Amino acid sequence: MLEPGDDAPDFELPDQHGDLVSLSDFRGEHVVVYFYPRADTPGCTTEACGFRDSWDEFEDRDATVLGISDDPVSDLDSFAEKYDLPFTLLSDEDGSVSSAYDSYGEKNMFGKTFDGVFRNSYLVGPDGTVERVYEGVSPDGHADEILADLDG
């Protein structure tokens, strides 16, 4: 698992509009990189809407939010539009970025084993280093937890 003080792995992924976005594009500001299993499912919607509802507070702190899943771009576009999400969603269909962030691997659900995205988040500082790691987060209140850490 990445730890505070580690360099956050840079990446380049397509966003919900198909445009390529890199972590390094946001150098100089805080970035919340949050990994979620599947767009438009109950937990992931709760988490995304928490970030949406707190968006102004993130902007007030010069912080941005990047949500990453292994969904295709078209699903991310629909998800962002349906819930009026103001932040960037990124498609990591091959799981390579999620893996680099220790957020992809074997999961068990309903007696089935499969590979998928873990619900982890990272607060990346303006210098590109990991400031905080949130492992196995609860979708409820996660945005507020990160805002409190930004104020810390």
Please report, for each region that a protein language model flagged, where it lies by residue.
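Chalcogenol-based redox active-site neighborhoods
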Residues: 1-152
